[in-house]
Design a protein with these regions (language model features):
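Non-heme Fe(II)-dependent double-stranded beta-helix
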Residues: 2-38, 44-152, 158
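Non-heme Fe(II)/2-oxoglutarate
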Residues: 2-21, 65-73, 197, 222-224, ...
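Short, conserved beta-strand element in jelly-roll/cupin
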Residues: 157-176, 216-219, 224, 248-252
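Double-stranded beta-helix
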Residues: 174-232
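Short, basic/aromatic beta-hairpin or loop at an interaction surface
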Residues: 191-203, 282-299
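Short, flexible, surface-exposed loop segments at domain boundaries
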Residues: 256-282, 294-334
Length: 334
């Protein structure tokens, strides 16, 4: 049985450690069996540390410019005591405000030769990374008092029609206090008497406590999990360390990948997207089209069909998943 990780925080239940999948690399059938059983793969020390270091360096450069970390450290983000009331790395999807989102270091990272080669081996194909990246620099002491789980949810309800895998990686050491990410093992599969999984998140107390898994993370580790796997970030209870991580979403490039571009035309029946290659692609929209926009607490919630032409604007950067010409999913690039 996996070791238990315990916490001095009374709101944090003991959790078993994630199963490590390194021994499955190179065995496609074994990887698929583990995925079907658990809903995730966890790998230790598989991502090139130099590439991870360069990615972390972008985070640290941004945070030094903000004046909130010890400028002498290049291995971690250590709070220097500066006020954090207006700390802008909030990952809330608001355009033009998050300085890490403006830098968008994911693109350089996934083209690093060793990183690209590893993910192609893992996916068994060249990888299509959707323009949806989460950059986390969670301040020390962040989170609600008495609640360690930041937001219980699955990504599937908010990503209709996209067969994505979520790839989460720590960029600096994450110990028990700093938190990291926890997930519920084996609860990705359809089952009778399941708990509701609405787009706005999963209710407290419905996930069996013995399903939760976590780890103490190091740079080079990688956690890949299903869109249907319940998970949550854990509140950062450290006194001084920011929690640095990035999660990206990908699928085999040979699959039915979404169209990425800007909105060129839109009405109550269809949307046209202009791609960087100069193409214009038009898709029907209907009552089943899941379209989301950035709108505060309702970010991630689907728009009604009549709201789509009102709230999506010409020129908006989006990506669109489609099935036989009908858009199943529309969302802003992020």
């Amino acid at each position: 049985m996996a070791d238990m990780i315990t916490s001095t925080s009374t709101d944090t239940p003991p959790m078993r450690e994630l199963r490590v999948s390194n021994h499955l690399l190179g065995d496609r059938a074994a990887l698929e069996r583990a995925w079907e059983r658990d809903g995730y793969w966890f790998f230790r020390d598989v991502l090139d540390k130099d590439a991870v270091g360069r990615l972390r360096g972008v985070y640290l450069e941004v945070m030094r410019d903000l004046g909130v970390i010890d400028p002498t450290r290049d291995d971690a983000a250590v709070h220097n005591g500066a006020p954090l009331d207006d700390f802008p790395i909030r990952n809330d999807g608001t355009a033009g405000k998050d300085p890490l989102m403006l830098r968008y270091p994911r693109d350089a990272f996934v083209t690093e030769p060793k990183i690209k080669a590893f993910f192609e081996q893992l996916f068994g194909d060249e990888v299509f990374w959707v323009p949806n990246t989460e950059y986390h620099a969670l301040p020390p002491g962040a989170g609600r008092e008495g609640r360690r789980f930041n937001f219980l949810h699955c990504d599937g309800p908010n990503n209709k029609g996209l067969p994505l895998k979520i790839c989460w990686m720590p960029l600096a050491p994450i110990d028990e206090e700093t938190g990291g990410l926890a997930l519920a093992e084996g609860l990705h599969r359809p089952r009778m008497h399941d708990f509701p999984r609405p787009p706005e998140g999963i209710a407290d107390g419905v996930i069996p406590q013995d399903a939760w898994r976590r780890a103490l993370y190091q740079p080079g580790d990688l956690l890949v999990f299903s869109l249907e796997t319940p998970h949550s970030g854990l509140a950062n209870r450290s006194d001084s360390y920011f929690r640095l991580s990035m999660d990206i979403r990908g699928m085999p490039k040979s699959g039915n990948v979404p169209t990425v571009g800007t909105v060129a035309a839109l009405d109550a029946c269809a949307i046209t997207v202009a791609t960087e290659a100069g193409e214009q692609r038009t898709f029907r929209i209907d009552e089943d089209t899941f379209c989301r926009v950035t709108r505060g607490r309702l970010t991630g919630m689907p728009l009604a069909l009549k709201e789509i032409p009102q709230m999506v604007k010409i020129g908006d950067p989006v990506y669109v998943a489609a099935d036989h010409g009908t858009a199943t999913f529309i969302r802003p690039q992020h």
